[in-house]
Amino acid sequence: MTSRGFRLDQDNRLNNFAIEPPVYVDSSVQAGWTEYAEKMNGRFAMIGFVSLLAMEVITGHGIVGWLLSL
């Protein structure tokens, strides 16, 4: 016998935990990183690498030599 989501057990005691909501299972595996975040991270890494190469061409020193000359 069910009434408004409650169920009576064999001893006619009210068991309001008898009807559980269905469990939703997501089949896609994610570790917290979204596709958008991965694209942005890759783009910023490319910008940083290209600017590092440009600085090396302009100054004639690498990043370590430039930092040591400060």
Swiss-Prot record:
Keyword RNA-binding annotated: no
Keywords (A to Z) from UniProt: Membrane, Photosynthesis, Photosystem II, Pigment, Stress response, Thylakoid, Transmembrane, Transmembrane helix
One Pfam family hit: Chloroa_b-bind
One GO term (biological process): photosystem II assembly
MF annotations from Gene Ontology: chlorophyll binding; pigment binding
Coiled-coil spans in chain: none
Phenotype reported upon loss of the gene: No visible growth effect of the single mutant; double hliA-hliB deletions are out-competed by wild-type in high light (500 umol photons/m(2)/s). Quadruple hliA-hliB-hliC-hliD deletions die rapidly in high light but grow normally in normal light (40 umol photons/m(2)/s). Quadruple mutants are sensitive to norflurazon. In a quintuple hliA-hliB-hliC-hliD-hemH deletion chlorophyll half-life decreases 2-fold while the half-life of PSII proteins does not change; photosystem II assembly intermediate RC47(1) is missing (RC47(1) is PSII monomer without CP43). De novo chlorophyll synthesis is very slow.
Cellular component terms per the entry's GO annotation: photosystem II; plasma membrane-derived thylakoid membrane; thylakoid membrane
Motif, Chlorophyll-binding motif: chain positions: 38-43
Top-level taxon of the source organism: Bacteria
Listed transmembrane segments: 31-58
Compartments, as annotated in UniProt: Cellular thylakoid membrane
Entry's induction text: Transcription strongly induced in the absence of photosystem I (PSI). Increased translation in the absence of PSI (at protein level). Expressed at very low levels during growth under normal light (40 umol photons/m(2)/s), induced under high light (500 umol photons/m(2)/s for 6 hours) with maximal expression by 1 hour and decreasing after, after growth at 4 degrees Celsius for 6 hours and less induced after nitrogen or sulfur deprivation (at protein level). Upon return to normal light protein levels drop rapidly.
Topological domains annotated Cytoplasmic: 1-30
Subunit note: Forms heterodimers with HliC, these are associated with photosystem II (PSII) assembly intermediates containing CP47 (psbB) but not CP43 (psbC). Other studies detect it in PSII complexes with CP43. Associates with PSII assembly intermediates close to CP47 and PsbH probably on the periphery of PSII; requires PsbH to bind to PSII. Cofractionates in an approximately 100 kDa fraction the thylakoid membrane with HliA.
The protein's role, per its UniProt record: Involved in photosystem II (PSII) assembly and/or repair under high light stress; probably important for quick stress responses. HliB-HliC heterodimers associate with PSII assembly intermediates with CP47 (psbB) and bind chlorophyll and carotenoids in a 1:0.6 ratio. They probably protect against photo-oxidation during assembly. Complex binds mostly beta-carotenoid, but minor amounts of echinenone and beta-crytoxanthin are also detected. The complex efficiently quenches chlorophyll fluorescence, contributing to photoprotection.
Family: Belongs to the Hlip family.
Protein name in the entry: High light-inducible protein HliB
Species per Swiss-Prot/TrEMBL record: Synechocystis sp. (strain ATCC 27184 / PCC 6803 / Kazusa)
Encoding gene per record: hliB
